[in-house]
């Protein structure tokens, strides 16, 4: 809140904060990381899970990890804070792993819990999640008492199971519903929230709605997913930056379960379209029928939302057999032919171990190099050329052909090793941040996501 912001700003000024540790890699933690970096502090983010931004899947969070590191944020993932100590005015953060960090300031952004003590004291019923139980009209077990906001639990529209939703948008909508029901009697029902959220993380925008794959898996709900990397607007119009979108859907009828987007421009309007579609019970086929406003500065003739619908439709219909990054990472490739269908120049810049290079344009002439009696796994930069190659092979009698969903971009991001933090002196470490950084080999990384595939290699 604003009062906390003023206190943090004053503390930084009064105490000349140079190193800040943020415990918790959620929305608030990452927004604070950005602002503290802009204020001139070195920032470390400590997260107990293996990723930041819990509402999104790991493959999408990995894109955020990469961006945070490019901005100079030190990431400590799968690290739990055990204790804090203060000696001679210096604060030390101790991890359960034995690692410790020195800091001038520590911020805790470790989540919230429903405050229900007043309701309990009044004898009002609590639900399974220990939030305040309400009915469809947001009325509690006490007939004259209604409840809204973070403290209530309500069935999720997609699962029917109660959950706590800590978002301002639904809370404001609930307040309007309760006002109507208190004045006019219980006439307006609350339909529930699917958790549509968005955050600014330095230059990136990260958004999600509905159910991610990890939550569907945890709840034993069968699902499929599709991932694309598409320009926010027409590629020939200047300034088109890539956005990465992942959707989850039912493997039987294509019902849309969730969507996640990581990008720079146009993320907000796309996530709102997905949210509306999900709440209306739409299928992936419905995504291809959405009518988008199109002009080159704003979108493409085939909007990224529609493209996710087409890709998901190809998977559902059997036109494309999906290969997901975890399957490829964990696979024994002994009995598989792994083919990189990118150009030789792209292949020379790096590929997946065990892959042979047969460019898409040469595939028909070099098909005899691919054995017919074993599975063929294809990949390209983002998935499109792999899909085209899979159609060519299937048309020529290859039975077991799969295409890597999201292409090499998704695979590389999801399997990338988090760079060891550099520049934060651990307790007892005599090396200065500058010395520690200079000891590392100088590597300049350029984010060229605005360059058209494959780019001017």
Regions found by a protein language model. Name each.
Residues 1-15, 94, 100-180, 273, ...:
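FAD-site-proximal beta/loop scaffold in flavoenzymes
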Residues 265-284:
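A short, polar/charged loop-to-alpha-helix boundary motif
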Residues 1-39, 74, 128, 134-136, ...:
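Glycine-rich dinucleotide-binding loop and its adjacent helix/turn
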Residues 285-296, 300-337, 344-377, 381-441:
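Rhodanese-like catalytic fold shared by cysteine-dependent sulfurtransferases
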Residues 3, 27, 51, 59, ...:
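Residue-level detector of alpha-helix initiation sites
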Residues 151-265, 296, 300, 304-330, ...:
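Mid-to-C-terminal Rossmann-like scaffold of FAD/NAD(P)H-dependent oxidoreductases
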Residues 17-20, 27-84, 166-171, 188-189, ...:
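Rossmann-like dinucleotide-binding cores of NAD(P)H-dependent redox enzymes
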Residues 432-457:
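Domain-level signature for proteins that mediate thiol-based redox and metal-cofactor handling
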């Amino acid at each position: 809140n604003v009062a906390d912001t003023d206190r943090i700003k004053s503390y930084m000024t009064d105490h000349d904060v140079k190193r800040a540790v943020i415990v918790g890699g959620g929305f608030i933690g990452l927004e604070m990381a950005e602002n503290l970096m802009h204020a001139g502090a070195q920032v470390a983010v400590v997260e107990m899970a293996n990723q930041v931004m819990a509402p999104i899947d790991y493959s999408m969070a990995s894109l955020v990890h990469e961006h945070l590191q490019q901005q100079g944020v030190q990431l400590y993932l799968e690290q739990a804070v055990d204790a804090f100590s203060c000696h001679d005015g210096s604060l030390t953060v101790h991890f359960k792993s034995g690692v410790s960090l020195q800091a001038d300031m520590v911020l805790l952004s470790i989540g919230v819990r429903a405050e229900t003590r007043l309701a309990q004291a009044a004898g009002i019923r609590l639900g399974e999640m220990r939030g305040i139980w309400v009915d469809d009209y947001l009325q509690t077990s006490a007939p004259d008492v209604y409840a809204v906001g973070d403290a209530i639990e309500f069935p999720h529209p997609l699962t029917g199971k109660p959950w706590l939703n800590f978002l301002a948008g639904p809370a404001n909508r609930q307040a309007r519903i309760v006002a109507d029901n208190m004045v006019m009697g219980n006439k307006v029902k609350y339909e529930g929230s699917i958790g549509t959220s968005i955050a600014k993380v330095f230059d990136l925008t990260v958004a999600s709605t509905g159910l991610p794959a990890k939550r569907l898996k945890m709840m034993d709900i069968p699902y499929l997913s599709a991932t694309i990397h598409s320009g926010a607007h027409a590629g020939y119009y200047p300034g088109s930056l890539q956005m990465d979108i992942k959707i989850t859907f039912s493997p039987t009828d294509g019902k849309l379960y969730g969507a996640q987007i990581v990008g720079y421009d146009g993320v907000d309007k796309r996530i709102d379209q997905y949210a509306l579609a999900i709440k209306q019970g739409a299928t992936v086929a419905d995504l291809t029928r959405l009518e988008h406003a199109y002009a080159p500065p704003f979108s493409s003739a085939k909007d990224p939302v529609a493209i996710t619908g087409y890709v998901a439709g190809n998977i559902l219909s059997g036109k494309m057999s999906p290969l997901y990054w975890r399957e490829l990472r964990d696979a024994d490739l002994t009995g598989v032919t792994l083919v990189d269908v990118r150009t030789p120049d792209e292949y020379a810049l790096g590929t997946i171990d065990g892959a042979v290079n047969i460019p898409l344009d040469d595939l028909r002439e070099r098909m005899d190099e691919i054995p017919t009696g074993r599975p063929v796994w294809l990949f390209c930069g983002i998935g499109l050329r792999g899909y085209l190659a899979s159609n060519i092979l299937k048309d020529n009698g290859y039975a077991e052909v799969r295409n890597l969903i999201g292409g090499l971009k998704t695979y590389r991001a999801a399997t990338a090793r988090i760079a060891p933090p550099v520049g934060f002196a651990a307790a007892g470490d005599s090396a200065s941040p500058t010395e520690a950084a200079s000891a590392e080999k100088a590597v300049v990384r350029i984010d060229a996501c605005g360059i058209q595939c494959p780019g001017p290699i």
